[in-house]
Amino acid sequence: MAADRIPATVTQYIPLSIEAGDMTDMAHFNLNNIPKILEQAYVYIIQNAQDTYREFFRIVSEERNTPLLFHCSAGKDRTGIAAALLLGALGVDRKVIMEDYMLSAEYLKGKYDAIVQAHPEFAPLTTVRKEYLEAAFQTIDSDYQGLENFLRNQLGADIDRLRALYTE
């Protein structure tokens, strides 16, 4: 993994992590089911990483933290969910959120070629699929009565403040 290249204008760095879990022992997984496993991982993140996303929304709600850059080592799963939740809080339509999420596939092209060449069965781990984020949204809709309720009640997001900060 290459070192972070953070713009010189960044004035503060706030590490905020969600444990990815130990994916090193792939022997226990049926590698043909990796897409289904990743769908389940997105559901797991929604259900079990709420403290971290609550802190994320606290940070992005503070004007002193704007403008804001957030990222992750791969930048597609945990960060993809964060971006989707933030865009949802800002009132962006889900279709547009999904289009934005799917752009990650384009930006990740080539990044994992050596791994996929050596282990083609790992290819689904190196990209995004709409089913992954759809699984997260389905969980939010069914378990938390929709995105706005999830954001406000589970994550403590101040949607009005976020919209005032990030939209015109």
For the regions a protein language model found, what residue spans apply to each?
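Ser/Thr-glycine-rich phosphate-binding loops at phosphate-binding pockets of nucleotides
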Residues: A74, R78-T79
